[in-house]
Amino acid sequence: MQRCVIQRALTALAALCLSACGAAAPPADLYKAKAFVTGQDERNRRSGFAQSLPDVLVKVSGDPQLKDDPRVAALAATVETLAGSYVYHDRMEGLPIGDEQGTRDRPYDLTVSFKPDLIDAALKSLGREPWTAARPRIVVFLAVRNHARDYWLARDSEFGTDQRDAMASAAWTFGLPVQLPPGSAIANLPLTFDVPPKERLQNLADAAKAAGGDVALAGAMAWSDGFIGWHANWQLITKDKTYTWAIRDVSFDEAFRSAMRGTAQILSGHGQPE
């Protein structure tokens, strides 16, 4: 009986998601990265450029292992030659500036557009290639347990607005086309916080493809009494293999970064996430 319920729910999911999955294309912002800075002076801007460099190298290559590569830190010494344009977004937009000190300390998101040819050359010097082909479209099926409340994270659900924003931000950081199903399509799917059985994972993979996606990312994220942060498990279902990884005692922002970081690493051919 439960199998029939699951199959009906997955069929509904495919029908409802189909129009939301457009054709895969290279990410428009592939050579952009963001950093948090205070003020708009040149010193902080250089610091923001240096913060952004590892992120754009990871984003373009798909290899998160570059983040801690000491050779990337050495490249940061010439980061201003790699950066093209940049733009600030005031995190306190709409709030008045109180004084001159407030001007220096005002928080901004600095978005840096790097020069594609120079970033590609930098990657080749690090033994990597740019991952510029159309990237697989990912449909995310995520069960959330927040203390006493369990729910599917859906693109239109009452719960999880901040989590949806965090997932979108993480997907942008790693250059991945990601979408959530509508709540009506997954309402009848049984919630589970254990690693799903192989048959269930295959059903999700089939539903993702029927919905116009390329791969399914199944996850379970929980916060309960006694935890000091979120616990998250992820399974990326590809044609050849299902990859599993986990993260513990983190913010949900970091849990989503773990999901997107691992997905990018796998799909770009850089191995199994830890």
What does each of the following model-derived ranges do?
Residues 49-73, 136, 140-198:
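N-terminal segment of the mature soluble domain
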